[in-house]
Regions:
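Sec-dependent N-terminal signal peptides
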Residues: 3-16
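Short S/T/G/P-rich N-terminal loop/turn motif that feeds into the first structured element of a domain
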Residues: 19-172
């Protein structure tokens, strides 16, 4: 069976640097409901996820590949234990009323951050731009893949590359 690994290039993405685990799910927006969905997500994010102490939820639109035009919703956490923490009831109610009716859920995964292969420069800032690259490899190519990731990090460090790159592996 193929192993799925993700390299998440988070360009200048500081707000989740300490996050070690991401719970991600694909959201397939229903035909004709894109504007309502995007409006509901934007308002919910402004209301409930705009402070340092709020849950870390991020919603990204997928631009290319087989899931183009779908969205991925990610909840960043320090550890898997946080999955046991309930989401704020008002926040969940708002989501269920203003976003949930407009999509169906696709695949869901848990990702763990590989700190040894991630590159986060001290001088990086925060931005809304993200690039996610999924790599699929056969079991026989696992060592080659991780050697490649080590070399990418080394090159970034040696060149003084100023953007962040977080490497995650699929944990579920």
């Amino acid at each position: 069976m193929k192993k799925i690994t993700i390299t998440l290039l988070l360009i200048l993405f500081v707000s989740s640097l300490s996050a070690q685990v991401g719970q991600a799910r694909i959201l397939e927006v229903k035909d004709g409901h894109m504007d309502k969905f995007m409006s509901g997500v934007a308002k919910k994010t402004q209301m409930y996820n705009n402070s340092e102490d709020s849950e870390k939820f991020y919603t990204f639109q997928i631009l290319t590949g087989p899931n183009a035009t779908d969205f991925i919703r990610v909840r960043w956490m320090e550890s898997m234990n946080e999955l046991d923490n309930p989401v704020d009831a008002d926040e969940l109610s708002y989501w269920n009323k203003n976003a949930r009716p407009y999509y169906t859920e696709g695949a869901a995964r848990i990702w763990s951050r590989n700190a040894n292969l991630s590159h986060v420069p001290e001088e990086s800032g925060n931005t809304n731009l993200r690039r996610v690259i999924y790599y699929n490899y056969k079991d026989s190519g696992e060592q080659d893949f991780w050697r490649f990731r080590q070399r990418v990090k080394k090159a970034m460090v040696e060149s003084g590359y100023g953007s962040a790159m977080n490497v995650l592996g699929c944990a579920s």
